[in-house]
Design a protein with these regions (language model features):
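A conserved beta-strand element that flanks and buttresses the S-adenosyl-L-methionine
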Residues: 133
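C-terminal helical/coil "lid" or tail adjacent to the Rossmann-like core of SAM-dependent
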Residues: 220-274
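A short, conserved alpha-helix within the catalytic core of class I
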Residues: 140-153, 162
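Glycine-rich SAM-binding Motif I of class I
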Residues: 47-51
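Class I SAM-dependent methyltransferase Rossmann-like catalytic core
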Residues: 1-34, 46
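Conserved S-adenosyl-L-methionine
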Residues: 43
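Conserved catalytic/acceptor-binding region of the Class I
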Residues: 156-229
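Class I SAM-dependent methyltransferase SAM/SAH-binding core
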Residues: 53-120
Length: 298
């Protein structure tokens, strides 16, 4: 199987749609300014969150800045955003090499595509947003030290979604001891990333945000739950599951504590479960809507 990261981001749209905490989303909709908010999304990938916010009628008139360090993602977004926008009945105009204008009688959205490391972007950005979005991203960063820079990007609100919180479950069980070992070692690789990361970032954000004098307006679980219906996974969720196993393989295939043959057999068995529509995958995550208060947040 060919593994493409943009394809993975496409495949998890329906998974994320279900997972996003709807109470936190309702709080966002109640607080987001109605008149042309400026939104910055860091680690934005190919722009799936922008599409979601349009589909869900969360934004109509907005300036939306997509920031991602992977050139592959930004290039894909540049082609894909006009495709789905046109399919949704919107007109699309390109403005230079890195801007898109999506519009009709209801929508007027200016999109800026920024290929940049998030910390480089923080250093040069001097126009704070009304809303900062970090979707499935904070658990990849050093915490809590990254938060002050991130919060400098918003004058008021931050929507921090799908923050992993230490629970990964594959069902049915293959080998209880091996399943637990693989989960433990995989979580440990998150904690040991050279670039930072935290396998329990969800629960830890409560304390981190409090220490910054940021007000948590809403918080709740946003678990990924993927299972087949009638032996078939919805949308492209089978590809999503294969990619999750690919993450495990890439992270653990040379781990000194893990028996190589046992792990290879485990991966093969889990892939067979996907083929037969038997695999259930659950990952526990947390969403937050946060209000920045005063200068302590910067």
């Amino acid at each position: 199987m060919e593994y493409s990261f943009p394809h993975y981001l496409l495949s998890k749209q329906s998974v994320d749609d279900r997972a996003l905490n709807k109470d936190v989303l309702a709080a966002l909709m109640a607080n987001l300014p109605n008149q042309s908010p400026r939104i910055i999304e860091v680690g934005a990938g190919i722009g799936t969150m922008l599409r979601r916010l349009v589909r869900w009628d969360v934004i109509h008139h907005a300036e939306y800045v997509i920031v991602d360090e992977m050139a592959e993602n930004i290039e894909y977004a540049s082609e894909w955003i006009p495709q789905w926008a046109t399919g949704a009945g919107l007109s699309v105009e390109r403005i230079g090499a890195s801007q898109l204008w999506l519009f009709d009688k209801t929508y007027n959205i200016h999109v800026h595509l920024e290929k940049a490391d998030v910390f480089d972007f923080i250093q040069r950005e001097n126009k704070p947003a009304d809303l900062l979005i970090a979707h499935a991203f904070l658990d990849l960063l050093p915490m809590p030290e990254s938060l002050s820079g991130l919060f400098s990007l918003t004058r008021k609100f931050a929507w921090l979604t799908l923050n992993f919180d230490g629970v990964t479950t594959f069902e049915p069980t293959l080998d209880t001891a091996l399943d637990k070992q693989i989960e433990r070692l995989y979580h440990h690789t998150m904690d040991m990333r050279a670039t930072g990361g935290d396998s329990r970032s969800g629960r830890h954000l409560f304390g981190h945000l409090k220490s910054m004098d940021a007000e948590i307006l809403a918080a709740g679980a946003s678990d990924w739950v993927v299972h087949a219906v009638g032996r078939k996974y919805p949308e492209e969720e089978a590809y999503f599951l294969y990619f999750i196993l690919h993450f495990f393989e890439e992270s653990l295939q040379k781990h000194p504590e893990l028996n190589t043959l046992a792990f290879a057999g485990w991966l093969q068995a889990r892939r067979k479960q996907i083929e037969h529509g038997d695999l259930v995958y659950i990952a526990h995550q947390m969403d937050f809507l946060v209000k920045r208060n005063g200068e302590k947040s910067v």
